Structures are given as C-alpha cells and as structure tokens.
Amino acid sequence: MLVNFVLVGFGAALGAMLRYGISVLVKSKWKTNFPFATFFINITGSFLLGFLVSSALGPVWQLFLGTGFMGGYTTFSTFKVESMELKWKTNYRVLFSYLGCTYVFGLIAAFLGLMLGV
C-alpha cells in the first residue's frame, strides 16, 4: 500500500514540474490575455490521460502515470481561477473563448487519446 502512495507522489511531482516548466516557457513567449499555458497543459493532459486509460499498461504504471503524473500535470483549479480572473476583468470575449475552447478541445483530445490507446 505504501508503495502505491510513493508511486503516485513521484508521478505527481514529475507532472507538476513539467507543468511549471511549460507554463514558464509559454508565458515568456506569448504575452496575451488568453491563458495559453493552462489551455495547452489541460488539452495535452486530456489526450495523454485518454491514451493511458485505454492502453494496456499494468496497474503500477496506471498509478504512476495516470493518477500521479497526469494528476500533477493537469490543473482544473488553475483553469477555474484564470476564468474568474477574466470575468473580474470583464474580458468576456476571452473568458467565453477560453471556457468553450477548453471544454470542446479537451473532449476531442480525450476522445482521440482513448481511440489511439486501444
């Protein structure tokens, strides 16, 4: 049981470090009101998690990569906070674009990941 916690913890740490690195890189390259870093992270995360779920990985890899790494990599809470910040700035065009694109492309990415992982 302890091994499972360690697997999830290490996976989450690696996923969070990758998320941070991507976020810093994207924010340094593109100065825009649209939160491209979180958008990119969550869309690629949706694809990768779909792929992992439908692949033939064993339970140890599912814990490490699926629960741990992808849990640390993707960020639902940042998505919501950034959405609220856009609302407070009354930047509704960007807000609704962000919400719509994240949900639509997230579903498409997850579907493609599921199909490719089979």
UniProtKB/Swiss-Prot annotation:
Pfam entry (one): CRCB
InterPro entries hit by this protein: FluC (IPR003691)
Residues annotated to bind Na(+): 71, 74
Highest taxon of source: Bacteria
Record comment: activity regulation: Na(+) is not transported, but it plays an essential structural role and its presence is essential for fluoride channel function.
MF GO annotations: fluoride channel activity; metal ion binding
Transmembrane segments: 5-25, 34-54, 56-76, 98-118
Keyword Transmembrane annotated: yes
Location relative to the cell: Cell membrane
Major subcellular site: membrane
Keywords: Cell membrane, Ion channel, Ion transport, Membrane, Metal-binding, Sodium, Transmembrane, Transmembrane helix, Transport
Topology class, membrane: Multi-pass membrane protein
GO biological process: cellular detoxification of fluoride
Record's keyword annotation contains Transport: yes
Catalytic reaction list: fluoride(in) = fluoride(out)
Signal sequence region: none
Bridged cysteine pairs (disulfide): none
GO cellular component: plasma membrane
Role of this protein: Fluoride-specific ion channel. Important for reducing fluoride concentration in the cell, thus reducing its toxicity.
Family in the record: Belongs to the fluoride channel Fluc/FEX (TC 1.A.43) family.
Protein name: Fluoride-specific ion channel FluC 1
Gene from which the chain derives: fluC1
